[in-house]
Swiss-Prot record:
Peptidoglycan polymerase that catalyzes glycan chain elongation from lipid-linked precursors. It is an enzyme of class 2 (transferase). GO terms for biological process: cell wall organization; peptidoglycan biosynthetic process; regulation of cell shape. Its EC number is 2.4.99.28. One of its GO terms (molecular function) is peptidoglycan glycosyltransferase activity. This is Biosynthetic peptidoglycan transglycosylase. It is found in: Cell inner membrane. It is a single-pass membrane protein. One of its GO terms (cellular component) is plasma membrane. It catalyses: [GlcNAc-(1->4)-Mur2Ac(oyl-L-Ala-gamma-D-Glu-L-Lys-D-Ala-D-Ala)](n)-di-trans,octa-cis-undecaprenyl diphosphate + beta-D-GlcNAc-(1->4)-Mur2Ac(oyl-L-Ala-gamma-D-Glu-L-Lys-D-Ala-D-Ala)-di-trans,octa-cis-undecaprenyl diphosphate = [GlcNAc-(1->4)-Mur2Ac(oyl-L-Ala-gamma-D-Glu-L-Lys-D-Ala-D-Ala)](n+1)-di-trans,octa-cis-undecaprenyl diphosphate + di-trans,octa-cis-undecaprenyl diphosphate + H(+). Belongs to the glycosyltransferase 51 family.
């Protein structure tokens, strides 16, 4: 029995280490190569393979600064200053969730969201949050802030089977991400992090509030 337990533990540890090696190798490759698919894209496609995934890579300089500032204002105002985790934001989210009795604020940074999008899934669990933290830690040490924001903008979801700011710009506004206005950039940023719902419910008061908030504060956003 003891031998069986030891063997089971060794197998589990080996499996966990293999996952970390896969994440490390993926991050090393993606330092200089476009990200063509993510775990979220795969899961979305597997849920309905009749619809193609819409996504088109754009380099950092080919994306409007309006959107860069908008997404930082909407999702992670301290993006250029933290090392992957906004501890004050996490504390605020915990207090807000405790008061409401449910999860209404996640407190995740852009780096954490990207780690989840690239490698994990959306269901909340301690195991997923732990793996997300490890992937975020590795990413922040292997990639520059500019690279993190570049990959995030190209891989984040903006609707059903719709990923990346270029595909979203064409879907919602029939223009390239390079030519987004401030209002259009704020609209796209406000879709996050619940794009499938807001894609069909653009009159939701929460969406309108987030768009106004983003428009107001994006002028103060610091981008890499």
């Amino acid at each position: 029995m003891k031998r069986f337990i030891v063997r089971a533990v060794l197998i589990l540890v080996s499996f966990v280490l293999l996952i970390q090696l896969w994440i490390f190798c993926s991050l090393a490759w993606w330092r200089t190569h476009p990200v063509e698919t993510t775990m979220f894209m795969r899961l979305d496609y597997w849920s309905d393979s009749s619809k193609p995934i819409q996504q088109q890579w754009r380099d950092y300089d080919e994306i409007s600064d309006n959107f860069k500032k908008a997404v930082v204002a909407a999702e992670d105002g301290k993006f250029v200053h933290h090392h992957g985790f906004d501890w004050e934001g996490i504390q605020y989210a915990l207090e807000k969730n405790e008061k409401s009795g449910e999860v209404v604020n996640g407190g995740s940074t852009i780096s954490q969201q990207l780690a989840k999008n690239l490698f994990l899934y959306n269901q909340r669990s301690l195991i997923r949050k732990g793996q997300e933290a490890i992937a975020t830690w590795m990413m922040e040490r292997m990639w520059s802030k500019q690279r993190i924001l570049e990959v995030y903008m190209n891989s984040v979801q903006f609707g059903d089977h719709l990923y990346g700011v270029e595909a979203a710009s064409h879907y919602y506004f029939h223009r390239s991400a390079q030519n987004l206005t401030r209002d259009q950039a704020a609209f796209l940023a406000a879709l996050l992090p619940n794009p499938k719902y807001y894609q069909e419910n653009r009159n939701d008061p929460r969406f309108k509030f987030k768009k106004r908030f983003t428009l107001k504060y994006m002028r103060y956003s610091e981008i890499p």
